[in-house]
């Protein structure tokens, strides 16, 4: 984890670059304090420093229960971003809205879920010689409809 002053300087520089570019962009101030065993006080202090330096929202990986989400929501000077889609997440979007979360990140969880399905299909073909994995797929019509909308 970066020294706090260095992290603030980096966010300040990123904000200047974003503003100079003129394109819509969300600058996220991420603090990994909870992931490295730090407490909520340090987490909130760092996140508020990042917001003051120009971050549009504060991203706090590791905030998952009502306390670790609710405290930053109440004490931050800007919106909170949390990560969901990890193993064991039981909160819903409605739960997160009620707690005051303004942005949700899913990271690579959707891709990892797809890789899991791919690996299951490959193992089924290699080990059993069957193709039942294909029973759970989008039809060509559904795919074409999705691509037309995109």
Regions found by a protein language model. Name each.
Residues 1-82, 86-106, 113-115:
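Alpha/beta enzyme core
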Residues 16, 108-150:
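Extended, intrinsically disordered, low-complexity segments
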């Amino acid at each position: 984890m970066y020294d706090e002053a260095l992290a603030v300087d980096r966010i300040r520089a990123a904000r200047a670059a974003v503003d100079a570019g003129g394109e819509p962009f969300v600058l996220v101030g991420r603090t990994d304090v909870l992931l490295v065993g730090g407490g909520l006080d340090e987490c909130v202090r760092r996140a508020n420093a990042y917001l003051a330096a120009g971050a549009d929202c504060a991203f706090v990986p590791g905030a998952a229960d009502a306390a670790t989400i609710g405290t930053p929501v109440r004490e931050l000077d800007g919106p909170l971003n949390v990560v969901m889609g990890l193993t064991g997440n039981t909160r819903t979007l409605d739960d997160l809205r009620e707690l005051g979360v303004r942005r949700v990140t899913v990271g690579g969880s959707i891709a990892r879920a797809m890789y899991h399905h791919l690996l299951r299909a490959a193992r089924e073909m290699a080990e059993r010689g069957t193709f039942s994995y294909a029973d759970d797929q989008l039809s060509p019509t559904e795919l074409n409809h999705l691509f037309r909308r995109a």
